């Protein structure tokens, strides 16, 4: 009986893996080449303009894609406002008060709808906008696989449980990424997104006041704008990369070598553990970082997409049709 149950479970697991592989296989970089040939150019122009107006927006759009893919897969669920039937993801602890860029996404969606209504999903817009944001700030490019569809619901609970917290140690970070079938290399490469953007005091306070693996001068610098008492200056911002905060480069890793990682989770990548070697490699070989980051972004973009007739193509990204 136990053997029969085990066999049935194995078959179910294989079927789930096969379904995931099929969904990813349905994505294609040329998905809109006939149905909306101007889609990618329209998105790129809007992203480039938004980042030129505010460099931080590049990091915000990249983060939106990451926070979308880690909850229910890359399905645009992070963009949904609360409704009478579900509470969205925007008020989850990792998102509340910090996730941003919705107005830019709405603007992009409106421009794309004007070109080809009802064709391009919000999930795909996030994926393309993330790539174009990185490029606009001097980072690598990659071919974005397309054909995702939009979810009709969101999950506050999954956003709270599945988005990696800045307080995680290396073991838990590795587990959080493994849950999404991302490797340790993916973890270290994708963390390099912290070469741009800002973080709130409440998310790095414990690191600069309590941790021992932090450069003393760096801790003093950050404490000037982040009081020790919780509730005091929680929303004060600091750059994740003090060296080149608006350039997408490999300075994040050189910062880690000097124990100048802003978040506890950042410095965990270079703290005497299994990822130290990869951090050193990325710090010394920017081309390797760019290559691995691009590959990891493609893999992350393949997390549980809705394809075919699943979900819908939202007319407005903040609500279901």
From Swiss-Prot:
The active site is at 67 (proton acceptor). Keywords: Calcium, Disulfide bond, Glycoprotein, Heme, Hydrogen peroxide, Iron, Metal-binding, Oxidoreductase, Peroxidase, Pyrrolidone carboxylic acid, Secreted, Signal. One of its GO terms (molecular function) is metal ion binding. One of its GO terms (cellular component) is extracellular region. Its cofactor is heme b; Ca(2+). Disulfide bonds join 36-116, 69-74, 122-317, 201-226. Heme b binds at residue 194. Belongs to the peroxidase family. Classical plant (class III) peroxidase subfamily. Removal of H(2)O(2), oxidation of toxic reductants, biosynthesis and degradation of lignin, suberization, auxin catabolism, response to environmental stresses such as wounding, pathogen attack and oxidative stress. These functions might be dependent on each isozyme/isoform in each plant tissue. This is Peroxidase 70. It comes from Zea mays. The gene is PER70.
